[in-house]
Amino acid sequence: MADNRKYYYLKLKESYFDEDAIVLLESMQDGMLYSNILLKLYLKSLKNGGKLQLDENIPYTAQMIATITRQQVGTVERALQIFMKLGLVEPLQNGALYMSNIELLIGQSSTEGERKRRERRALQEQ
């Protein structure tokens, strides 16, 4: 039986790091840390359509985010406040955070889809 897993990936435009919000973020003290945290949060939210949740009922807290991003809680709390001010993250009514514009960054594929793409490429190269 074939192993057909679904994969999610983050698609960044070539100009991602030139966007105003990212330039402003990285120009701040600890901005490179914040940028790193932001990318990790985008990746963490992919499977949930942009929501930062451990599961359907448990939204990530600042402490949990600090643990998964390997950063200090204070750094994560400051980063989240800045992300909200810049419109990169929005709080939801259930306490979860939503990564704004995530729909522009999400891609998905499956192992079966990848296998078919490889076959098509091989046929085109013949």
Where on the chain are the PLM-derived regions?
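Positively charged, structured surface patches that bind polyanionic biopolymers
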Residues: 1-94, 101-106
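Amphipathic, positively biased hydrophobic alpha-helical segments used for protein targeting
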Residues: 42, 98, 122-124
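Charged low-complexity intrinsically disordered patches
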Residues: 2-3, 107-126
